[in-house]
Regions:
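Core catalytic architecture of nucleotide-activated donor-dependent transferases building glycoconjugates
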Residues: 161-217, 221-227
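Conserved nucleotide-sugar phosphate-binding/catalytic loop shared by glycosyltransferases and other
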Residues: 8-10, 36-71, 232-239, 298-304
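A short, glycine/small-residue-rich beta-strand->loop->alpha-helix junction that serves as a flexible
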Residues: 8-20, 187-196
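Nucleotide-sugar donor-binding patch of glycosyltransferase catalytic domains
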Residues: 115-119, 130, 270-332
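Short amphipathic alpha-helix
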Residues: 16-28, 42-49, 53, 203
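Nucleotide-activated donor-dependent transferases that construct or modify glycoconjugates
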Residues: 1-12, 182
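Donor-binding and catalytic core of enzymes assembling or modifying cell-surface/extracellular glycoconjugates
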Residues: 197-285
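Conserved nucleotide-diphosphate donor binding/catalytic pocket of glycan-assembly enzymes
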Residues: 58-159, 179-186, 190, 197, ...
């Protein structure tokens, strides 16, 4: 059977969630190919944290170098590994744009090499690219469409792959309606992506004033934050604190109980996007063009676009409330 290798240099859950629709679409289109995923951090999330998404077709490569592509020594080490394991891929797809990583990745024997690095210099075969999509995944999708004479279709994750136990749990945790999700914690601590606490409180109080129920999507480790919110918003709901289930599939199931969600750029945003529910996504130091989910109804607030600044604090509660009102009109 033929083989496709997808190289993903990101190490977070959000980085992995973002490529799911591409993985599914490749699997459906290239039915005579096996799909292999090479993650630079070797965390194999589809074998553990994301196992319940039931994407069982994804295979792990014999390339086990930690931080693959990020170390110059890999340029020399990959040769002996390739020879020892007789490694060859019909198609290699590069989902990052660092020159060093791409040069090392391209040393793996292949027929077709798809990469946007250095203005698509490493593409094999060569072809002209007119669409300059900023989101690298959708840039790659455009490349594949050209290769397949526009027959390649990007599909969405089917949440019916998730076991019923998660949806049953979501029904218990959120048994009514008029819920609005709020996600305000960030995984990457190197760039400030979190809104000020008082902004969150103002937004929550506004939601209550229009008969909505604020649902905080916060992991149990953030119990101090939960207590702080509860001291200000007595009717706040924290479903994850009332469940023994700790799995991203529960978040996706909870999302289907929400009218919409308000979130910063974090892993939860990408998890919720698999449910394809309406969303207000708030960006500060990160690029909304690169990282905003492609879902049916998303309202993007970017401080870079609105104020030419990476300061997320410039996106005030009043600005967010405008988007809330817009979603209310659209969803009612």
């Amino acid at each position: 059977m033929k083989k496709i290798l997808i190289y993903n240099s990101g190490g977070g859950i959000g980085d992995t969630i973002q490529i799911i629709n591409l993985l599914i679409s490749l699997h459906d289109h290239y039915t005579d190919h096996e799909i292999y995923l090479l993650q630079a951090h070797q965390n194999n999330l589809f074998e553990n944290l994301l196992k319940e998404l039931n994407l069982n077709f994804i295979k792990i490569t014999p390339i086990k170098f930690m931080y693959f592509g990020f170390r110059f020594k890999h340029y020399f080490q990959i040769n002996s590994l390739v020879k020892k394991n007789n490694i060859f891929f019909d198609i290699i797809i590069d989902l990052q744009s660092k020159l060093r990583n791409t040069i090392i990745l391209k040393k793996i024997p292949h027929n077709i090499f798809i990469s946007s690095t250095l203005s698509s210099f490493f593409l094999k075969p060569k072809f002209e690219i007119k669409n300059k999509e900023k989101n690298i995944i959708y840039r790659i999708v455009n490349y594949i469409k050209i290769l397949t004479n526009n027959k390649f279709i990007l599909k969405k994750y089917d949440i019916n792959l998730i076991k019923k136990i998660y949806f049953d749990e979501a029904d218990k945790l959120l048994p009514s309606d008029k819920y609005v999700g709020i996600s305000m914690t960030q995984g990457n601590l190197y760039r400030k992506k979190t809104l000020p606490f008082d902004y969150i409180i103002q937004i929550s109080k506004y939601l209550l004033s229009i008969n909505k129920k604020p649902v905080f999507l916060i992991e149990k480790k953030h119990f101090k934050l939960k207590e702080k919110i509860e001291s200000e918003i007595k009717d706040a709901i924290f479903p994850e604190f009332n469940s023994n289930i700790n799995d991203p599939c529960l978040l996706i199931s909870l999302a289907k109980k929400l009218d919409y969600t308000i979130t910063i750029d974090n892993g939860i945003m990408h998890i919720l996007s698999l449910a394809n529910i309406p969303m207000i996504a708030i960006f500060g130091p990160t690029s909304s063009d690169k990282f905003a989910p492609k879902i049916d109804n998303i309202k993007i607030l970017s401080s870079q676009k609105l104020f030419n600044s990476k300061n997320i604090n410039l996106i005030t509660p009043e600005i967010i409330i405008e988007k809330i009102n817009l979603l209310e009109k659209e969803t009612n």
